[in-house]
Amino acid sequence: MRRIAVSSVLAVSLWGCSHAPSTPPAAPPPTSASQPSAAPPPAPASSAPPAANAVDPAAVQALQKMGAYLQTLRTFEAQVDLSGERVLQDGQKLLHMATAKVDVQRPNMLRAEMRSARSARDLIYDGKTVVLYLPEQKYYSKAPFTENLDALGNRLQERYGIELPVADLFLWGTPQAPLDNMTSAMNAGQDVVEGEVCDHYAFRQGNVDWQIWIAAGARPLPRKLVITNRADEARPQSVSLIRWRINPGFKESRFAFTPPQGATEAKFVPLKSQ
């Protein structure tokens, strides 16, 4: 059996790079002794960063309402268009794109198909075994797993370095929802996303600013997500646009994996043994 590492094979790597320090401002010209004295300059402004917007409880409640609705969905299909910026050493930004199609049947079935110009990856989970398949190379790896979908993303990331697309969709509406360490939360009004009126919210957590557009009305589905990395002075962003199909009729075979002819099994390599 072939042994390969799978660390980060599903992640779209869009991290920013370091930058040279900015040029300091020029010193002011000297004042001539023959000139009349000018009025004393104003006191310098504080160098402290401006205070963030307060945490609006209504914005947090909107996330909780969205999460509660997501937890009611037994089957759904989410199609995601992802674009993300990579920052070069000289500060120039490159935009990369990928797509993902995620089919879900709660509590424990999933099929995710991820595609970009650089790679193709399929992740299949039937409630007993999780399989990673590389269709272009015809390699597949599998590991036993029996937990629900809200635990799948974290376990794959922690043990194998595999990133599940839109993994937070399974956490919203649970005690594990990422609501901690918020320093800013605000309602930014309404926008239209692909013809659908959405409520626009903005949040700050640590070195991350993120915005979410949630469909207005009885089905508060997340339609668009923008994440900004504040730890990088270039502020690179990733943008996810999500299209939904609710209650599709999946056959059980959708979540089963049969190795194609000529496919080779490759052993999962946990991160701790790499």
Predicted regions span which residues?
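Post-signal peptide N-terminal segment of mature Sec-exported envelope proteins
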Residues: 23-55
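Bacterial N-terminal signal peptides that target proteins for export
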Residues: 1-8
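Gly/Pro-enriched, hydrophobic low-complexity segments
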Residues: 81, 116, 131-132, 141, ...
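N-terminal mature ectodomain segment of secretory-pathway/periplasmic proteins
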Residues: 54-139
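Bacterial signal peptide processing site
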Residues: 18-20
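Flexible, processing/modification-adjacent segments and terminal tails
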Residues: 41, 49-50, 54-62, 90, ...
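C-terminal motif of bacterial Sec signal peptides marking the signal peptidase cleavage site
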Residues: 14-16
